[in-house]
Amino acid sequence: MKKTSLLCLFIGLLALCSCRQPVPRVSIFADHIATIAHQENISFAEAATRVRALSYEGVDVSTTIAADRLRTLDSLGFCHACAIANIGYIDGPQEAAEEQALAFMKAQGWSQLLLVPGLVPEGTDDDAVEEAIARIAAFVERAAGEGLRVMVEDYDNPRSLCYDTAALDRLFAASPVLGHVFDTGNYLYCHEDVLQALDHFRSRVQHVHLKDRRDDGSCPAVGGGIVPMAEVIGRLRASGYEGWLTVEHYGSRIMYDDASRSIAAVRAMMAK
């Protein structure tokens, strides 16, 4: 049998069973697949096929992803790990952006949404920040009423509404149902202890971004930096975490190689 036929058969079998595999499962960003396509000078579909063959089971996508790319991912059996919406709440009410995000979720069958709430301009007063937080809480409640889960991550910019533990605590105090996307590398970025942050927010963690970092701040493949990844994964599993582990290394110049190394490292850590 030709190699291409064997690959298609393998991917077909993955598509049939991957969404029913034991948790946690490993996913990747659709943006990383697009980067692979660009770096390898191949189509998005071919890049997605190669990534799927590495045994990635899910994908994180923007709610503005091109329709043809979304169809490709679905056809290859990628599970819906998490959708992502950038909504700048500090700029005022965001009805149009909210409607777009919710429409995508419902039309395409996604249940988890990472909300990236924008950056706070320098000099913004605290009343404006409180108004933005109230808008976020209202959107989260509305989405929950429609059966959707909304989360925020620890975002690596000091002007973010969810930059560090203190900022996240402020958001979570405003919404009992707001979830957390735990980004391992971003706690290191804001000079906080990753494991302490995990213990602090464990009850809110509903999705995970496995981002490693080097001392210079760059993001290598999982296991190539100084983030205690094995300990993070071990604590998540011990606590009964049933969500996704999405590998992340934006900025990689060898994205396919990093994707291959990352999933191998994560599988090895989970096998212990």
Model feature map: region roles:
Residues 1-5:
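Positively charged n-region of N-terminal signal peptides that target proteins for export
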Residues 19-107, 111, 179, 267-272:
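N-terminal pre-domain/capping segments
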Residues 25-27, 58, 79-82, 111-114, ...:
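Structural preference for beta-strand elements that scaffold enzyme active sites
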Residues 29-33, 62-64, 85-89, 118-120, ...:
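Active-site beta-loop-alpha junctions enriched in small/polar residues
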Residues 51, 59, 105, 150, ...:
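Conserved, mostly hydrophobic/aromatic
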Residues 105-125, 146-156, 246-247:
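Active-site groove signature of glycoside hydrolases
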